[in-house]
Amino acid sequence: MGLAAPRKRTKISHDPNNTTWSRSTDGFGHRILKAQGWTPGSFLGPRNAAHSDLFTTASASHIRVVLKDDNLGLGARPKRGLLDEPTGLDAFKGLLGRLNGKSETQLVVEQQKRDDIKLARYAAAKWQAVRFVSGGLLVQESNETLVPPTSQNGQADSEVKNVPQGREEGLADDETTNSDSEDRHSVEKRKKKETNSRGSREKERKREKRQMRRDKKRKTSESTESEAEMQEKTRVQGPSEDVKPTEPKAPTLSRERRPMGRQMFRGRYIAQKKRALMDDKSLNEIFMIST
C-alpha cells in the first residue's frame, strides 16, 4: 500500500474463528442441560432409543444450518450440469490414449462409449421417471361357430357328414364373416338412431327455452307499459284532498317467477318519490307546514 492509498485501521478480533460461544460452559443452555443429566460429547435423548444405531459423530456436535437462498421447494435438488465434467475432457482423454500407443479403432470405441453415456445421462435428467411401455395388440374375438340344428328327416346330418373338411372350414368362415357384418350393421343402425334421438331432444329443449324467453320478455314489457299508463293518468288528473289517488291495479302475476332485479326496485322508488312531490299534502308534511 502506497502513501496515496486511504488509511484504514483494522482491528483483529480476539476470536477470529468465532468459537468462543460454542466452547463456553457458562451459558444458560449448557448449565440446564448439565442439570438434566447431559454431559459434553453425549447424544440428546434416551440412550437405549430405537434409532441409536443411526447416531454418528455429527449427532454430538453443534447443529449446522444451511442458508436457503433460492426459491426451490423442500427436498428439491439444485440444478446441476448435465455432464458434470470440465469442457474438453474427452478430447484430452483421446490425446492421452494416442500418446500411450492406442490404435484408432480403440479410441473410436472408447469415444462411442463416452457419447452413449452422455446421451443416457442427458435423457435421464431431461425426462425423469418416464418409462415407455409397449402397447398390446388389439385382436377381435372370434364368434363360436353355431352347430346347425338337426332336421326331422336327418338331411342336415347327412349333408354335414358328406361335406369335405376344406369346405367345412370355408363355410364356417363365411358364417363368421356374415355374423360379424350383421353385428356391425346392427350396431351402426343403433348408433344412428341414438344420435338422431339425441339431436331431436336437444332441438326440442332449445325451442322450449326460446319460447320461455319470449314469454318472459312479453310479460315484462306489458307490465312496464301498464305502469307507465297509470302514472300518466294520475299526473293528468292531479291529486285532490277529498279524492284519494287511485292506485294502479297490480298486473296479474303468472305462475312463473319473475326475476326481481335492481332496476325494478329503483324504478319503484323513483315512482314513489314523484307521487310524493306531486301531492300537496305530502309536501306540507315534508316541509312541516301546518294548514
Curated annotation (Swiss-Prot):
One annotated GO molecular function: nucleic acid binding
Q: What is its main location?
A: nucleus
Keyword ATP-binding on entry: no
**What's one GO-annotated cellular component?**
nucleolus
Start-end of Basic and acidic residues biased regions: 194-205, 230-247
Q: Which residues form the G-patch domain?
A: 25-79
> Which is an annotated Pfam family here?
G-patch
Q: Which region ranges are annotated with the description Disordered?
A: 1-26, 146-268
> Could you tell me the keywords of this UniProt record?
Nucleus, Ribosome biogenesis, rRNA processing
Its subcellular locations are:
Nucleus, Nucleolus
**What exactly does this protein do?**
Involved in rRNA-processing at A0, A1 and A2 sites and negatively regulates telomerase.
Descriptive protein name:
Protein pxr1
Q: Which organism is it from?
A: Aspergillus clavatus (strain ATCC 1007 / CBS 513.65 / DSM 816 / NCTC 3887 / NRRL 1 / QM 1276 / 107)
